C-alpha cells in the first residue's frame, strides 16, 4: 500500500501528519511524494478560515481527478467541524474527526498490527524522527482555552492539554538522534503545563525548556505558537 500525504495549516498539523505517516509505516505502508503513484491519500485539513476549508475541498477533488483509483481519507480540524460535509463528498473514502493516527491508519490498513503507545491526553505516540530536513517537530501541547470569536480552533481541537515532561524529554532524545534542531509545536504552547498537576501550575514552559537543555544538550530548540494561533 502506497500512501500520499497532504498537509494544510499550522506546524501542529505537520506534526500530526508525521504521526499518521509513522503509524501507517508500522503497518507496512510506504509513503510516496507523487499522488499518481499512491493507492491512498491522507488529507490533513485546516479550518482557521473559510478559505482553508475551500482549499481542502479543492485539493481532494484534484487528487481524485488526477488519480481516480485513489482512496482518500480526510482528517484534521476541518474534518472535525465538517464531518458530514466531507463524508458526503463522492471523492472521499473515509473521514476522521480530528487527528487520531490510529483511526486514520485503521481506515487504510485495518488488519495490520498497531504501534505500542502511551495513553496521553493528546493521543500521540512518540515520534522517532521527522522525514524531512534538519528540523524535527515535537508537539508539547494541543488545544486552546481561549474563546476568540474569529477562531474555530477551540471547537476543532478542544481544551488545552499538555504532554508530560517525561514523554517530551523521551521524544526529544529520539528526535535528537536524527535532527540538529527541534521545533516545539502546539496551538498555545505558552499555556503549557497549566492543566497538569490539577492546575497547581507546578509545570511551565520555562521549566520544561530548562529540563530539556540539561537532559538533551546536543540539539537546538526553537519555539513556535507561544500564543494561540
Model-derived features with residue positions:
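Proteins enriched for Cys/Gly/acidic motifs involved in redox and nucleic-acid/cofactor modification
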Residues: 1-193, 204
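Conserved radical SAM core fold
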Residues: 188-193, 219-220, 228-229
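Short aromatic-enriched loop/helix-cap "lid" or pocket-rim segments at secondary-structure transitions
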Residues: 196
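Alpha-helix-loop-beta-strand connector modules within alpha/beta enzyme cores
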Residues: 199-220
Amino acid at each position: 500500500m502506497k500512501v500520499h500525504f497532504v498537509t494544510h495549516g499550522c506546524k501542529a498539523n505537520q506534526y500530526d501528519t508525521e504521526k499518521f505517516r509513522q503509524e501507517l509505516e508500522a503497518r507496512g505502508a510506504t509513503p510516496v511524494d507523487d499522488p499518481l503513484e499512491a493507492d491512498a491519500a491522507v488529507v490533513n485539513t485546516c479550518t482557521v478560515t473559510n478559505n482553508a476549508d475551500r482549499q481542502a475541498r479543492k485539493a481532494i477533488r484534484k487528487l481524485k481527478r488526477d488519480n481516480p483509483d485513489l482512496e482518500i481519507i480526510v482528517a484534521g480540524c476541518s474534518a472535525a467541524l465538517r464531518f458530514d460535509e466531507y463524508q458526503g463528498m463522492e471523492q472521499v473514502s473515509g473521514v476522521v474527526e480530528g487527528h487520531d493516527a490510529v483511526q486514520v491508519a485503521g481506515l487504510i490498513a485495518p488488519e495490520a498490527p498497531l504501534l505500542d503507545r502511551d495513553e496521553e491526553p493528546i493521543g500521540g505516540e512518540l515520534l522517532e524522527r521527522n522525514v524531512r530536513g534538519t528540523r524535527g517537530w515535537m508537539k508539547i501541547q494541543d488545544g486552546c482555552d481561549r474563546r476568540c470569536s474569529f477562531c474555530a480552533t477551540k471547537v476543532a481541537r478542544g481544551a488545552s492539554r499538555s504532554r508530560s515532561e517525561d514523554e517530551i524529554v523521551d521524544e526529544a532524545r529520539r528526535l535528537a538522534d536524527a535532527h540538529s534542531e527541534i521545533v516545539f509545536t502546539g496551538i498555545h504552547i505558552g499555556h503549557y503545563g497549566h492543566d497538569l498537576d490539577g492546575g497547581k501550575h507546578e509545570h511551565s514552559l520555562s521549566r520544561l525548556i530548562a529540563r530539556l537543555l540539561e537532559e538533551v544538550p546536543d540539539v537546538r530548540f526553537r519555539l513556535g505558537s507561544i500564543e494561540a494561533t
